[in-house]
Amino acid sequence: MAKVIGIDLGTTNSCVSVMDGKDAKVIENAEGARTTPSMVAFTEDGERLVGQPAKRQAVTNPENTLFAIKRLIGRTFEDPTTQKDKGMVPYKIVKADNGDAWVEAHDKSYSPSQISAMILQKMKETAESYLGEKVEKAVITVPAYFNDAQRQATKDAGKIAGLDVLRIINEPTAAALAYGLDKKEGKTIAVYDLGGGTFDISVLEIGDGVFEVKSTNGDTFLGGEDFDMRLVEYLASEFKKEQGIDLKNDKLALQRLKEAAEKAKIELSSSQQTEINLPFITADASGPKHLTMKLSRAKFESLVDDLIQKTIAPCKAALKDAGVSAAEIDEVVLVGGMTRMPKVQETVKQLFGKEPHKGVNPDEVVAMGAAIQAGVLQGDVKDVLLLDVTPLSLGIETLGGVFTRLIERNTTIPTKKSQVFSTADDNQSAVTIRVSQGEREMAADNKLLGQFDLVGIPPAPRGVPQIEVTFDIDANGIVQVSAKDKGTGKEHQIRIQASGGLSDAEIEKMVKDAEANAEADKKRREGVEAKNQAESLVHSSEKSLQEHGDKVSETDRKAIEDAIAALKSAVEASEPDAEDIKAKTNTLMEVSMKLGQAIYEAQQTESAHADAAADAKRSGDDVVDADYEEVKDEDDRKRSA
């Protein structure tokens, strides 16, 4: 049976894992790393780079290197968080025809689902390379506090990447699965997940294979990216004070600042001080300018203290919703790269009154949990029951714009709930059902997920028709809503798709684009491999010809030289043809065989001569020494007498 993989699609980094026997194994990517930067870049010549190769060239290509795309997924362009993000990134965020936030690179627009799909494709290829077989099914994680539009957009990304997404699972829940799979005794745990772009807190009861989420809370726009930007702003303002130049207007300088900020942040988790050194960051009439600054851990902590404090209110809300006090939490599990920061750990310790558990790898535990859930769905992992919750209340807009809840937040999913409503006016023949998600009392203040009309209601006084509205949330946390006129039996049902969101036709087009790109990427890779092999063969052939050319006839030598020249010409062409390079590589290999044979024969002859000389030496060395006695002749005896 084909394996189902688990993918942690992160804001900053992504990770893929698979069940290996009874354990979840994190798979290394082509670059040998266990996590992959969630970055996609488009180069001048149309090449698409994903992961570490994209990150490496970000400084020289900031406008076409897309990162932290997860923060835009499922969001509209007018969303305040989108507008905030616009000022934080060097690439363009644009308004799509449907009002969604899309991104632009080299004058081409992409949906966040499309860019996320490119990262998912990379994770898919990583798994396929390790497993040696095709991968078509996956479990993908999302922040627990993602709304329906964001979950749907993530599922769309999986589809575009060629994956059948069996389950969307919340990141803290996945982490709890990986942490508690072998725990038999009952425990109440809190998972504090501060990642690259989002913050989640979940309270769970775990024990003997049952994982029940009691509550969840969070902030989908709070994470490591904000910590980095806070430091970037500080560095830019200090530089402006010293040099009078605003680096924020220079996208290339801004990208260098961002990389330096991320590096400094990581170093300050283990050191009390770090030095930021950026030579030639900019220039003016007086010449080049350099940025050099010492930064202490205490200064960095003061810059980001309010961001850390923003995690406290969601933690308190989650504890309240779960009906437990901080003292009743047996263990606090830290997840996400930002939890390596000592100040974050100290804040968690103060809040919960205990040392947080650091026994899991915060970068890998979510992907491992996704792989365990994949194992559960596949039947490889037995006796595990996972009960998750919906993070936000769901309801409809009723008379006066009031938000009427049908499903309260932290309700265990899957779930189904119905409620009967009526008309607001006499002889009303149609009603518009406006579905929202959130915690505010007025519908306009919550996230509108979608709307639809129920038509054909028979004329009747207001309040008489009975319209039953049913909400159905599946295990992925994705909502389906239906409305039924109980008098006529007429029903209208929709899977909620955000007022923006991708249509099925758009998704299908993106799937085809992704497949075409995968084919183009494969051809490009084959071309590079063919070129590398050709250049290596040219080098070795020229060297062999130089050293041993006198061992073959003039005709053979000329044939090799011609083949080398032809292959060089193919490699150096303005648009190299992989098939042409392969054919000319084979030709050179064939004509070089005579040279190789001559070298081999010459070596054999030399070896034979060497063996003969050695044998001769050995036979000379075998002469036996004889004992002898000196005998004097007669004359000698006479002379001595």
Swiss-Prot record:
Protein name as it appears in the record: Chaperone protein DnaK
HAMAP family: DnaK (MF_00332)
Keyword Chaperone on entry: yes
Disulfide bonds: none
Acidic residues: bias regions: 622-633
CDD domains: ASKHA_NBD_HSP70_HSPA9
One Pfam family here: HSP70
Organism from which the protein derives: Sinorhizobium medicae (strain WSM419) (Ensifer medicae)
Gene encoding the protein: dnaK
Residue positions where Phosphothreonine is found in the record: 198
Induction cue: By stress conditions e.g. heat shock.
Sorted UniProt keywords: ATP-binding, Chaperone, Nucleotide-binding, Phosphoprotein, Stress response
InterPro entries: ATPase_NBD, Chaperone_DnaK, Heat_shock_70_CS, HSP70_C_sf, HSP70_peptide-bd_sf, Hsp_70_fam
Biased composition (Basic and acidic residues): 514-529, 540-554, 608-621
Region (Disordered): 514-554, 604-641
GO molecular function: ATP binding; ATP-dependent protein folding chaperone; unfolded protein binding
Family: Belongs to the heat shock protein 70 family.
Functional description taken from the UniProt entry: Acts as a chaperone.
